[in-house]
From Swiss-Prot:
The keyword Transferase applies. It is an enzyme of class 2 (transferase). Involved in both the arginine and lysine biosynthetic pathways. Its cofactor is pyridoxal 5'-phosphate. Pyridoxal 5'-phosphate binds at residues 96-97, 123, 207-210, 265. Its main location: cytoplasm. This is [LysW]-aminoadipate semialdehyde/glutamate semialdehyde transaminase. It catalyses: [amino-group carrier protein]-C-terminal-gamma-(L-lysyl)-L-glutamate + 2-oxoglutarate = [amino-group carrier protein]-C-terminal-N-(1-carboxy-5-oxopentan-1-yl)-L-glutamine + L-glutamate; [amino-group carrier protein]-C-terminal-gamma-(L-ornithyl)-L-glutamate + 2-oxoglutarate = [amino-group carrier protein]-C-terminal-gamma-(L-glutamyl-5-semialdehyde)-L-glutamate + L-glutamate. The lineage of its organism: Archaea, Thermoproteota, Thermoprotei, Sulfolobales, Sulfolobaceae. Keywords: Amino-acid biosynthesis, Aminotransferase, Arginine biosynthesis, Cytoplasm, Lysine biosynthesis, Pyridoxal phosphate, Transferase. It comes from Sulfurisphaera tokodaii (strain DSM 16993 / JCM 10545 / NBRC 100140 / 7). Binds 1 pyridoxal phosphate per subunit. Substrate binds at residues 126, 264. The keyword Protein transport does not apply.
Length: 387
């Protein structure tokens, strides 16, 4: 049996994780700023998550949501103070793309309209509906025709928002475009977007699969912009390392959904509910959101101090512990050098080194990562100069 590698192979066999670190099969320790593309924001093998999962495993592991469970009730109680504004309802799923699919379906049903608007350089997933609102043609074109009609507007361009009209069911937006280069939305753009969707009766869907649950220094990244969306997708960090996603909805939308409108065999399973319960406790008890905000500013400051003299560094940007270093060249060489220096990061867009650090990252870790990034970028510059 052969494993089909659909992601780039990093050439490492990882056998253990703890907090902000992972170890390979030879025992080499790495600082993990990749975190499974942002999943391990609460750290690898978080003790409270393990405790809740272990306890639940002794009782029951899987069950249809047709049946109630005490752990789901506990999860709802613990998550309640963290829920997005005015969203008292949740659909429980497994992966980010599932949450996006549910959001698109919900928007079409609620509005009775078909047209969806997304943004250039967006990424929302690889299943058929989510792929339809993902910009990268390399992902989309082999599988077309997909869901339609879908129109892509320019991110952060207020003038183009006039294309959101009375035929639009929903607009889906990332508050920070992660896959495309850690590009934050402008506040005036987000406010104009909210105003235009309300004006024409379209739903505003904020995709927070990567940005949500504390990573950007707010529980939800939309809170940086002074708006409230109609629907919000969450995933990655919300399960503390366990596969969970969710669609959050306000009452006025939830009350219009009927049995059979959506479903998920594993969604809301007891193990997932245990993971979200624990993750919610960690977020509150460890002041994770505040830590992400403070540490993110420290990290960006250190990066700027270490990298400001390098001519190929264009910009260091992001919010909280979602940080991008834009350089003049593709980051493959730099990422390999960083890996050799025992720091794991990942690519974003065509020229960005992306850091998705766990909240327990220390200043010493930040120094180590910044030094590794410097070495990697210098190596990139040298090789580019030669070739």
């Amino acid at each position: 049996m052969k494993f089909i590698q659909l992601y780039g192979d990093r050439g490492l066999t990882i056998v253990k994780g703890e907090g902000q670190y992972v170890w390979d099969i030879s025992g080499t320790k790495y600082l993990d700023l990749h975190t499974g593309i942002g999943v391990a924001f609460l750290g690898h093998r978080n003790r409270r998550v393990i405790e809740y999962l272990s306890r639940q495993m002794e009782n029951i592991m899987t069950l249809s949501t047709s049946f109630s469970t005490p752990i789901r009730d506990e999860m709802l109680k613990e998550l309640d103070p963290l829920k997005p504004d005015k969203m008292d309802n949740i659909i429980l799923l497994n992966s980010g793309t599932e949450a996006v699919e549910a959001a698109l379906k919900t928007a079409r049903k609620i509005t009775g309209r078909k047209k969806i608007i997304a943004f250039k350089n967006s990424f929302h997933g690889r299943t058929a509906g989510s792929l339809s609102v993902t910009w990268n043609k390399r992902y989309r074109e082999p599988f077309e025709p997909l869901m339609s009609p879908v129109q892509f507007l320019t991110y952060n361009n207020i003038d183009e928002l006039k294309n959101i009209d009375e035929q639009t069911a929903a607009v889906i937006v990332e508050p920070i475009q992660g896959e495309s280069g850690v590009i934050p939305a402008n506040e005036d753009f987000m406010k104009a977007l909210r105003e235009q969707t309300q004006k024409v009766g379209a739903l505003l869907v904020v995709d927070e699969v990567q940005t949500g649950f504390g990573r950007t220094g707010k529980v939800w990244a939309y809170q940086h912009y002074g708006i409230i969306p109609d629907l919000l997708t969450a995933g990655k960090a919300i399960g503390g390392g366990f596969p969970v996603s969710a669609l959050f909805l306000p009452d006025w939308i939830a009350e219009k959904l009927e049995e059979g409108d959506h479903g998920s065999t594993y969604g809301g399973n007891p193990m997932a509910m245990a993971a979200v319960t624990a993750a919610s406790k960690v977020l509150k008890e460890d002041n994770v959101v505040e830590q992400a905000s403070i540490k993110g500013e420290i990290f960006k400051k250190i990066l700027r101090e270490k990298l400001s003299d390098l001519k190929s560094v264009r910009e260091i940007r992001g919010k909280g512990l979602m940080i991008g270093i834009e350089i003049r060249f593709p980051p493959a060489i730099a990422l390999k050098v960083m890996q050799d220096e025992r720091v794991l990061a990942l690519k974003a867009g065509s020229t960005v080194i992306r850091f998705l650090a766990p909240y327990m990252i220390t200043q010493s870790d930040m120094e180590e990562a910044s030094n590794a990034a410097r070495k990697g970028i210098i190596e990139t510059e040298n090789k580019r100069a030669i070739t």
